[in-house]
Amino acid sequence: MRYYLGVDWADQTHAVWVVDEQGAKVASRAVPHTAAGLSEWGRELDEWRAQGIELWTAIERPEGRVVDFLLDHGVVVYPVNPKALDRARDRFRPSAAKSDPFDARVLAEFLRTDHRHLQALQPSSEAAQELKYLTEDYRRHVRQQTRLVNQLTATLKAYYPRALEVSELTTALARQFLQAYPTPVAVAALTQKRWQRWARAHRLSNARAQELWGCLQRPQLPVPDHVVRAKARLMLTLVEELTAVVAAVGQYREAIDAFFAGLPAAQWIRTLPIGDHGVTAPTLWALLGDAPRRWESWQHLQGHAGTVPVTIRSGQQRVVRFRFACDKALRYVVDQVAFLSLGKSEWARAYYDQQRARGHDHRPALRALGAKWLKIIFVMWDRQIPYDEQHHLATMTRQQLRQRGQKKVA
């Protein structure tokens, strides 16, 4: 016997709807997101399982505390795409009405009738999940760093554009310069001797110090004093925030590298020809996970990463378009792998150049190369084996010879 649960999660209270195999309602409840609320619900789930009832749950998000809770209680979890849920709502309503209990009911019924089209969540090991959280938080810090750099750039352009020529804003040199000389007036008051002293203290070469001195002495458009005062205050605030975020990005990078180095998967994933490039390899493995049978085939992996297009057929029409629905984080890291391999892999460079020669722009050519890499990465992941460039080149040569032979026979 099996019960189908629909869970519409929320920050405070989760709506739950339960139906049996015939679609008859078994129960519905609101579960407070508290220790007591989840504990009470957990007892109910355990009682059902003790009676020999199999529990399947549909939920919109594939991770989080509620998902962990359900897995801990032996519930099979099926993540449902929000777009699929939105379309399923129309089966049960004539209007656009919406509520949390209604969504929970739709999830339960959708799982009961369409579970053959869904894939049960295959949780990775705790180590893989921890690495995934680390890499996700790292990317959040990188995005925050980018936002602050953009804000700081816009602020300096408004009153102090010469300061942008000192160095990249993510460097300590640029931020220390801005803190020491926050306005054009402060720079104008500098003597060359004082500047040389500051440059030596910050380990600038004589040539670079002279170049910057000439740059800072060039006049800029006058800016009203009240604008300078306001923008200088904002600039110093942004510099403090950016300094903290830059430090956090570096700390996360070190933590990810150290954590990943202790995992067995590092021995094969680091053999990809991408060089020692930051967190690319750890992020790739974290997104792949280590749950058995998570990826059914390399085609499944390609579709999830969005490296292959979508084909739409209707009558005599056939349209091939870009795949928008995919794991954006995985798409990005596969693009990174493809790009970094251009300077490290002979066949990757040749394939990319071939795509460009056919008229494809950089992004489509890189995406096509990423699709090729995912075929290789799937085999590496499935068999836990390292990458061998020479073996792959030999395999490609045999395939090309076989294809030529088939053409001659034809």
Which positions does each model-derived feature cover?
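A detector of single, family-specific signature residues
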Residues: 1-410
